[in-house]
Design a protein with these regions (language model features):
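Structural signature of transmembrane alpha-helices in multi-pass secondary transporters
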Residues: 3-12, 38, 112, 197-205, ...
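C-terminal transmembrane helical hairpin of 12-TM major facilitator-type secondary transporters
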Residues: 132-177
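Helix-loop-helix hairpin linking two adjacent transmembrane segments in secondary transporters
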Residues: 1-46, 89, 93
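Extracytoplasmic gate region of multi-pass secondary transporters
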Residues: 69-110, 114
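A membrane-interface helix-boundary motif in multi-pass transporters
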Residues: 20-32, 214-233
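Helix-to-loop junctions at the C-terminal end of transmembrane segments
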Residues: 119-131, 216
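A late C-terminal transmembrane helix in Major Facilitator Superfamily
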Residues: 183-221, 228
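Juxtamembrane intracellular "pre-TM" segments in multi-pass secondary transporters
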Residues: 45-72
C-alpha cells in the first residue's frame, strides 16, 4: 500500500529530473525499462501466493450494499478529483504563479514526494490510536493545502513548505483509505473491493486533470488550488459527517 502511494507521488519529480537533463523521450524510455524489470521480477522471482477465498459475481451485491465501502469509494473519487485538479498542473503553477526557478520547482516536487514518507510514518504511529480523528485531520489537511496554494504562492519558502505538508497529507490519505477498504470489505471480496477502489481513484485522476485543464484554459492556472480545495471540502464534509458515522456503526457491530 505504502509502496504504491510513494510511487505515485515520486513519479512526477523523478520524471521531471530525467526530462530536464536527458530529454522527455528518455523519461518514457526509463518508465518502459522499469516496467520490464518489474514484470520480469514478478514472473521469475516473486514467490507464488496461494489464492484466498473464492469470489463470484453473484457476491458483488455484498460490496454495493455495504454503506461504509460505498462512502469510502465516493470520498476517494472526490479526493482524487480534488488532488489532481491541482497536482496535474503544479509544475507550471510553481513556475508561472509562484515564480520559482526550474531548480526550485524540481526541489519542491522532490520535497513533496519525500514528505509522503512522513505521512506514512504518521499513519503507522497514530492511526490505530484514534482512527476517526486521524481520518478527519487527513481530510481537513488536504483541503487546507489546496485552498492555501494560491494565497501564499508569492512567498517562496511558504509554498515549498505547503507542498511538503500537502504531500504528507496525500500519502496519509492513500494509506489510510486503502487500509479502510481491507478493513470494511468482506474477507472474500477484499481484492475485488481494492480493484474497484483503484478504478475509482483512476477515474478521479482523469476528472481532476480535466477540471484543472478547463480552469487553466478558461480562467487561470492560479485557481487550480482553489477549485481543487472546494472539491476537497465537499469530500471532507462527506467523510466527517457521513462516512465516519458508517464506520462507527460497522465497528460497533463487529
Amino acid at each position: 500500500v505504502t509502496g504504491t502511494s510513494i510511487a505515485m507521488i515520486l513519479g512526477l519529480p523523478l520524471g521531471r529530473i530525467i526530462g530536464l537533463h536527458m530529454g522527455w523521450n528518455m523519461a518514457f524510455f526509463c518508465v518502459g525499462i522499469i516496467a520490464f524489470i518489474t514484470t520480469a521480477y514478478l514472473i521469475f522471482v516473486f514467490p507464488k501466493v496461494p489464492g484466498g477465498e473464492s469470489f463470484s459475481i453473484k457476491q458483488m451485491p455484498e460490496i454495493f450494499k455495504n454503506k461504509t465501502l460505498m462512502g469510502i469509494f465516493l470520498v476517494t473519487f472526490l479526493f482524487a478529483t480534488s488532488y489532481y485538479t491541482g497536482y496535474s498542473y503544479i509544475e507550471p503553477f510553481l513556475q508561472k504563479v509562484a515564480g520559482l526557478s526550474d531548480n526550485w520547482v524540481t526541489t519542491t516536487l522532490t520535497i513533496f514526494g519525500a514528505a509522503g514518507l512522513l505521512g506514512s510514518f504518521l499513519f503507522s504511529h497514530y492511526y490505530d490510536k484514534n482512527k476517526y480523528l486521524f481520518v478527519k485531520l487527513v481530510m481537513i489537511s488536504v483541503a487546507a493545502a489546496l485552498l492555501l496554494l494560491y494565497p501564499i504562492s508569492k512567498a517562496h519558502m511558504a509554498v515549498v513548505l505547503l507542498c511538503a505538508f500537502w504531500g504528507m497529507a496525500v500519502m496519509a490519505f492513500n494509506v489510510t483509505f486503502q487500509s479502510e477498504i481491507i478493513t470494511y470489505a468482506p474477507a472474500a471480496a477484499s481484492s475485488v473491493a481494492m480493484a474497484i477502489y483503484s478504478g475509482i481513484y483512476n477515474l478521479g485522476i482523469g476528472s481532476g486533470t480535466w477540471i484543472g485543464g478547463s480552469i487553466c484554459t478558461h480562467l487561470s492556472i492560479s485557481y487550480i488550488g482553489i477549485a481543487g480545495g472546494m472539491i476537497a471540502v465537499v469530500a471532507a464534509l462527506l467523510c466527517i459527517f457521513v462516512v465516519i458515522k458508517y464506520m462507527k456503526e460497522f465497528d460497533r457491530a463487529a
